[in-house]
Amino acid sequence: MFNSSDSSRLIRLQVNGEARQCAAHMALPQLLESLGMNPRLVAVEYNGEILHRQFWQETEVQEGDRLEIVTIVGGGVFR
């Protein structure tokens, strides 16, 4: 059950090997935005598994989660 006082609680997680804190019950896209990332331009490994974009909105980060976030960069050959 959702408790409004619980929403102000901070949880600890690891993002790209660094300890971070965020609000409890934060959905993954909101976490990405709070980190200054464009959710449309990243890929996410969530606790050791690639998390498909279709599941991001329903995924709330939890205490102790481990995320690896990779920015997608277009490019080509530089000459």
PLM regions with names:
Residues 1-79:
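Ubiquitin-like/PB1-type beta-grasp interaction modules and other compact soluble beta-rich domains
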